[in-house]
């Protein structure tokens, strides 16, 4: 493949994972694209919980139908399948995305279903590493931080066609909490959700501006009611002074970010804070896991795309939990105050053979203090991880 063509193609694939989709049908205003990937992935780590085969396959489709000159219907579905388990072993596949919507020309689009929360609009800029990254505060099914369900999203590009580069989104998320005693409100459609993955009603918004020389600036905010179960757990934990589970009836997150993407150079940085929503340790907020009162998060990424297909990457990520719980032995109380929850340097490299085939290595250099009892007590790994993968995508 021509090197200049490859240099232009690779960044496009990174921005839009389905840009390489196979067109299945395109006739009479109806279009259907199929996309997917298979990642033969292996982790190497002294932590037994991370070391080993992590291979997976992913498949999805995007469809749209032209209703009239101004109105277009669309939908997307994406599914993930772990291929590192024995045949017949349960809980090895799940739906990542599933939503349907309408686009009203320059007036924007509206969709509902399982989709990305608007906070991720900014986080996506730094979530660009070969394997790791994007994990200081972004957690799946935790409010509107990452992929989540029950979200109604309105998006507008170029501000109704009046201001090129000015984009915004508005989002509403319905109640998702466990049914049964103590659920209190809503439909109880949360099933067997872990405590940290419950949520009350909430809203979010994001905005960004794309300059014509490759620079983008953005910000996002969300605020939600916490579930009755979360509030009750936090209240009870506060009464016994352990402080492992955040109190308060509202969960909030905000973030600001910037990226530069031009001349084969990619730079991105973001800062974010969360309150009463980010879980740490095991159990998704249950068992030996906890929910932080507050986190402060920072991520920065730098990459360069060579014409012959090589893309080196370096990043720094840190999340600091504030006013955390758990007994601090040498002081004899139940508060650790501030602790790093995530802290590492990432050095990676991807090589693209062509638009369908690539290989990568990603080295996560963990900077958490392995001698600090906080991490062992909360099930937080302090070991380095090296991920090596071979990817086929279409």
Swiss-Prot record:
Subunit structure: Homotrimer.
Gene source species: Salmonella typhi
This protein's GO CC annotations: cell outer membrane; pore complex
Subcellular location: Cell outer membrane
Protein name in UniProt: Outer membrane protein S1
Signal sequence segment: 1-21
Domain of life: Bacteria
InterPro entries from the UniProt entry: Gram-neg_bact_OMP (IPR050298), Gram_neg_porin_domain (IPR033900), Porin_dom_sf (IPR023614), Porin_gammaproteobac (IPR001897), Porin_Gram-ve (IPR001702), Porin_Gram-ve_CS (IPR013793)
Family according to the record: Belongs to the Gram-negative porin family.
Pfam family, one: Porin_1
Keywords from the UniProt entry: Cell outer membrane, Ion transport, Membrane, Porin, Signal, Transmembrane, Transmembrane beta strand, Transport
Region entry Disordered, spans: 222-242
Gene: ompS1
Function: Forms pores that allow passive diffusion of small molecules across the outer membrane.
GO molecular function, one term: porin activity
Gene3D superfamilies the UniProt entry points to: Porin
